[in-house]
């Protein structure tokens, strides 16, 4: 089973390597001894994320999640990095592919499938819904310091 590699850690950062997108299929997420999801890996813990979780997942042609799910508090953003498929939210089905981004509220009943001929690779970011305010959009500060390469 493929493992996440630590690149570097510091007081204010951590970096990890998940490998090539083509190799995401080699990860296996074990939810319980009898529940294994091939081609999925969560990464928030590997980088010490404190306000979100994320996962990479790959679906082979014809593969789907096989279930609908919701969240109690987490909104999700799905970024489709390659391939083609379909996404379903609350019974609405629509096409997704490389460059598509889907936001789903916690209550949205969601599922995804690959109806294409190539692997469908996605990055899912989940975070507490309704927590981001207009003021958060101006949270960044540009520093008057040289960049050291």
Spans of model-derived segments:
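Short, charged/polar surface micro-motifs in flexible loops or helix N-caps
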Residues: 48-52, 60-64, 84, 128-131
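Conserved short histidine dyad/triad with adjacent acidic residue
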Residues: 35-42, 55-71
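Short strand-coil-strand connectors
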Residues: 50, 88-92
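Short, conserved beta-strand element in jelly-roll/cupin
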Residues: 56-60, 70-88, 125
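A short, N-terminal "cap"/entry segment at the start of jelly-roll beta-barrel domains
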Residues: 1-51, 135-149
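Short acidic-glycine-tyrosine-enriched beta hairpin
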Residues: 91-107
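Ligand-binding loop in jelly-roll beta-barrel domains
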Residues: 86, 106-132
